[in-house]
């Protein structure tokens, strides 16, 4: 063996030795339910740089590095979207390279519409020029959120809007911490999260406002993690790093949406599980009923101005309803991390929209699949990949079916004219004549 180690298996397995507990499905259970369907889908860094796509603000490519992989990634995403059959789709992790012919979102829509009939075709929502960063982008990150819709099924109501999310900027030495008598000053912190995209639609004279979100990840730390000596470890509450920063974003979202008229649906990758602070702030948190204190982040700015220097305590949530919890309880998931399943991708609604829920489904095409079957080949060698929706991303899409029945126009019945008798029965006038004749004979 020339001093090389080899593996000598002592037992062989076959396909029949595996126990399957999550059977694949060709489409979500709600794909044909309701009057309108909305989906949320994290598309795992869909970039089109390798086919001449426009640059994003950071100039970096987080997606496919060769054209073959990019085409495979796009094909898997398209096949998933076709099967979802949603009328509106919120996207996360799509390249933030504008809305032109060489943008990632145009590239995706072109490929998607090539598989559909005209009445099923999609367009993307574009923000107004005044809201674009550097006249082109949604915020300054390499990735962004996006929204697709079917104009044959749903109508735009006004222009799209951007909800800017907080940033955290703490200069070096702005804060101190102490442990075992040693006092330290913080390094500088500059943290960002994706802006949210808002679009109102008109459906049968009703308004539906959809908000697509992608909050700060749990991976990189914020100054609160440094202050608690967690910059290199897991925070004690197990909610991941930058939790207070995500709470700040949830507060901004809640404040921005609390007075919106009509139905409201908040979707996207919140990078927070269903019982964690950011979701609690958007839904049913009440400080008077618990000892758990929820705080926003410190050193935050919003639209370039100081937002919260010290952070603040949240007293009450914004009252949105977790549709997955309403329909299925806590037994839902859309993501797998270190073998543990949980729900990072949410659909939160106000009361009027929650009453319209027909069905909701996390379509498990990614979370329980091996990431070896994703588009990338860096670590998979000659492993055969397929164009199926399975392993199209690392997050499961969530699909929401809603009831928006078309109004029924009342029909006023047309009175039928009285028909002349042609035998078998006597009309009213004939009876009157007979009565008159009878009276005359008696006289």
Question: Can you describe what each PLM-predicted range is?
Answer:
Residues 6-408:
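Divalent cation-coordinating acidic motifs and surrounding scaffolds
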Residues 419-429:
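Juxtamembrane/start-of-transmembrane alpha-helix segments at the extracytoplasmic/lumenal side
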Residues 427-443:
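A cross-kingdom C-terminal cell-surface attachment/processing module
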Residues 407-421:
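Ser/Thr/Gly/Pro-rich low-complexity, disordered linker/stalk segments of secreted
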């Amino acid at each position: 063996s020339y001093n090389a180690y080899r593996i000598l298996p002592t037992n062989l397995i076959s396909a029949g030795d595996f126990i399957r507990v999550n059977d694949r499905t060709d489409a979500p259970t709600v794909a044909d339910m309701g009057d309108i369907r909305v989906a949320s889908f994290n598309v795992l860094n869909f970039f089109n740089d390798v086919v001449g796509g426009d640059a994003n603000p950071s100039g970096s490519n987080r997606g496919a590095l060769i054209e073959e992989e990019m085409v495979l990634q796009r094909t898997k995403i398209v096949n998933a979207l076709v099967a979802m059959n949603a009328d509106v789709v919120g996207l996360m992790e799509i390249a933030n390279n504008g809305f032109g012919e060489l943008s990632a979102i145009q590239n995706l829509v072109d490929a998607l519409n090539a598989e559909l009939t005209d009445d099923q075709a999609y367009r993307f929502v574009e923000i107004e020029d005044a809201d674009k960063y550097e006249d082109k982008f949604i915020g300054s990150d390499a990735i962004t959120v996006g929204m697709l819709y079917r104009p044959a099924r749903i109508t735009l109501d006004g222009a799209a809007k951007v909800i800017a999310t907080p940033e955290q900027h703490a200069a070096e030495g702005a804060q101190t911490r102490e442990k075992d008598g040693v006092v330290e000053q913080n390094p500088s912190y500059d943290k960002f999260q994706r802006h949210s995209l808002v679009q109102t639609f008109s459906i049968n004279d009703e308004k539906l406002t959809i908000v697509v979100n992608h909050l700060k990840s749990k991976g990189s730390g914020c100054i609160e993690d440094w202050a608690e000596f967690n910059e290199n470890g897991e925070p004690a509450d197990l909610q991941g790093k930058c939790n207070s920063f995500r709470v700040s974003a949830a507060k901004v979202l809640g404040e921005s949406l609390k007075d919106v008229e009509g139905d409201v649906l908040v979707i996207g990758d919140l990078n927070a599980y269903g019982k964690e602070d950011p979701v609690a702030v958007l839904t049913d948190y009440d400080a008077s009923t618990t000892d758990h204190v929820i705080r926003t982040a410190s050193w935050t700015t919003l639209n370039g101005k100081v937002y919260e220097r010290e952070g603040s305590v949240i007293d009450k949530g914004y009252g949105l309803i977790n549709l997955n919890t309403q329909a299925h309880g806590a037994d839902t998931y859309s993501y797998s991390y270190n073998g543990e399943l949980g729900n990072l991708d949410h659909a939160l609604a106000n009361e009027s929209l929650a009453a319209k829920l027909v069905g909701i489904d996390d379509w498990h095409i990614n979370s329980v699949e091996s990431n070896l079957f994703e588009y990338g080949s860096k670590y998979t060698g000659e492993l055969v990949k397929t164009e199926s929706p399975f392993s199209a991303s690392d997050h499961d899409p969530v699909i929401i079916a809603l009831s928006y029945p078309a109004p029924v126009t009342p029909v006023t019945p047309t009175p039928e004219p009285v028909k002349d008798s042609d035998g078998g029965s006597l009309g009213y006038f004939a009876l009157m004549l007979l009565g008159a004749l009878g009276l005359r004979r008696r006289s």
